[in-house]
Amino acid sequence: MSFGKEAIERGTEIGSTENFKFDFKRDIGRPIASDTPDHTRVNSIILSALVLNEFRKRAYVVGQEMGQADGIKDAVITVPAYFTSDQRAATKNAGRIAGFNVLRIINEPTAAAIAYAHTKNAQGNVLVFDLGGGTFDVTIMRVADHAYDILATDGNSRLGGIDFDKRLVGYIMQELEKQGVNMTNLSEKEKIQLQYKAEQIKTSLSVNDQALYEHYVNGQGYGVLITQAIFNEITLDLLKDTEIKVQSTLQASGLKWEEIDHILLVGGSTRMPMIRQMIRLMSGLEPKFDLNPDTIVAQGASILADLIVNNEVSFSEHQDGKTTETDRVVVKDVTSQGIGLLFKKNPNKNYSFVGDYYNSVVVPRNSVLPLAVTKDLFAVVDGQSKFKLRITE
C-alpha cells in the first residue's frame, strides 16, 4: 500500500486507477462507499483507518527509538474546522480502528495557531486561512495568555488544491483539442499522468511565471504553455469562494481588518501566489508563512498532545477565558455548523424548507461552547405521547 506522491507515481507505472482512492477525507462521515478491485465496498472510515494505521506503524518505530517498548499509542487527530459532528465522530472511529487511543479531535486552524503562538510567542487576534488538498476553512481566534478563544469559523469541506488541479486538467485538454489532439480516448495511464503533471505545474507556478505541459501522440509532440495569469483566470471563481468565506467569517467574529494582528497561511495550497496576493489586498497585512504550511498543524497537534498527557490543557471549561495554575492552554471553541430541528410545513411560518419540512435553527453557527439551549415543542393532537426529532446540522 502506498500513499501520497508515491501512490501517484506507482499509478503512472501501473496505468490503472482501479485501486486508487482520491480525497476520501471529504466523504468521511457521509453515507458514501468506494469500490475495490474485488468489487467489495469500503467506506471512507476504513480508508482513513488504513492511512492512520500507517502513521501508527511509523510512530511505533519512532517510539522504540525513544525507548518506549510499546511504541506510541496515544494520538491527537486534527480535522478541518468546518467538519460536522458526524465527520468528527467518524474520524475518531477511524483512529480507533487503526489502533490509536484518540485523546482528542482538534480543529486544524487551532492546532496551527497553537504552533505559531508557541514558536513565535504571538498574542492578539489571529486569522487562520487553511487551504489544503481537499478542504478549506477560515477561523478567527483571540490568543491571550495561552487561551485560544475561537470567535468564528467557516469553510467548504469540498474545496481544496485538487479542485485547482482539475481546472488545469480541463484547460490542458481543451488546448490540446484545439491543436487536433483527440482527448476523448485517453488511457487510464494517460489520465493519471495528466492529473499528476497538472499538480506539478500548479506547484511550479508557485515559484515560476510559466510552465509547459508536453504531450506526445505516436511520436508527435504537442505543448501547452500555462502562465500564472492563465492559471489565475481559470481558477478565479475558486479564489472568489475563499474570499467570500473570509469576509463572512470576519463579519461573524465582530472584528474589523484593522483589529486582526496576525494572518496564518496553512496548507500546501496557500503557496499559490494569488492566495497571498488576495490576502494582502483584503487585509492590508502581510500573511505569515515563516512556519511550514504543510507541517504547522502537526506541530500544534504534537504540542497539544504533550499538554493533554500532562493535564495542562482544558477545552471550553473556563467561561472567563483565563488559565488556571494547572492549565497552560485553554481552548474555547464554537459550533462550526448551525443545529436545527425539522418540523412539518406550516404555511404561516417563514422558514427554510427541506422537502416537506421546515428547518428551525436552534443553535446558530459560531455559538460559543459549551452552551445549553431550550425550545418549547407542542403536541399536534391531544393525548400525543411521542414524537420524532429530526436534527439538522
Where in the sequence are the language-model features?
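Feature captures the FAD/FMN-dependent oxidoreductase FAD-binding
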Residues: 48-58
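Oxyanion-binding/catalytic loops of NTP- or PPi-dependent enzymes
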Residues: 1-27, 37-41, 61-393
